[in-house]
UniProtKB/Swiss-Prot annotation:
It catalyses: guanosine(37) in tRNA + S-adenosyl-L-methionine = N(1)-methylguanosine(37) in tRNA + S-adenosyl-L-homocysteine + H(+). S-adenosyl-L-methionine binds at residues 108, 127-132. This is tRNA (guanine-N(1)-)-methyltransferase. The lineage of its organism: Bacteria, Bacillati, Bacillota, Bacilli, Lactobacillales. The gene is trmD. It is an enzyme of class 2 (transferase).
Length: 239
């Protein structure tokens, strides 16, 4: 996968040199290039200006973004604008982006964008219902969530299939050694070696956590007969 990032602050992306994303780059599975669009600004390197019609704040000018975009070697990229008014990013969106060969992220700053910049864009995406100073942190979050889904980046596909949201449910509790730590012990079922009972316990705990913390996820989740029975028991125990 090739990712190009248009930003005023390339140095903010140093975390992408480490961990899973960094390893993907080392393996040659990922190429990330940064483009400081201030370098393409014509008016004394000014990238922003006052909005027509008045109003508070400054807008990113179209010219530096367009010229930086035109300079990128590309074929058929997915172009993502980080915008609080965009569609909310989620695991399904990450899975969709992971299928692409080319991504371009446009990271804004200031009050907003000249609307004409959006003619370059295929996707306007937001992390959530809050406003960040710029798009850089949002872009890094989306890149991390997307890159880890690329085949061969993590290794076993099952490593991320059990993650929260990948299955549609929140992830079940997990434990490692020692068995007893400060009086907190590992559930006996996980020590039993009985694979079917362990599967049932994990499914029950996933449903329980999802029902308690993110019941909205269950509105779009297709329950199996087994899951319906478990969820009914969970609700009954909560009453």
């Amino acid at each position: 996968m090739k990712i190009d990032i248009l930003t005023l602050f390339p140095e903010m992306f140093s975390p992408l040199e480490h961990s899973i994303v960094g390893k993907a780059r080392e393996k040659g599975l990922l190429d990330i290039q940064y483009h400081n669009f201030r370098e393409n600004a014509e008016k004394a390197r000014h990238v922003d200006d006052e909005p027509y019609g008045g109003g508070q704040g400054m807008l990113l000018r179209a010219q530096p973004i367009f010229d930086s975009f035109d300079a990128i070697e590309k074929k058929n990229p997915r172009v993502i604008l980080l915008d609080p008014a965009g569609k909310q990013f989620d695991q399904a969106y990450a899975e969709d982006l992971a299928q692409e060969e080319e991504l371009i992220f446009i990271c804004g700053h200031y009050e907003g964008y000249d609307e004409r910049i959006k003619t370059l864009v295929t996707d306007e995406i937001s992390l959530g219902d809050y406003v960040l100073t710029g798009g850089e942190l949002a872009a890094m979050t989306m890149i991390d969530a997307t890159v880890r889904l690329i085949p061969e980046v993590i290794g076993k596909e099952s490593s991320h299939q059990d993650d929260s949201f990948s299955s549609g449910l929140l992830e079940y509790p997990q434990y490692t050694r020692p068995y007893d730590y400060r009086g907190m012990v590992v559930p006996d079922v996980l020590m039993s070696g009985h694979h079917e009972k362990i599967r049932q316990w994990r499914l029950y705990e996933s449903l329980k956590k999802t029902y308690e913390r993110r019941p909205d996820l269950l509105e779009h989740y297709q329950l199996t007969v087994e899951e319906e029975k478990m969820l009914a028991e969970i609700k009954e125990n909560k009453e």
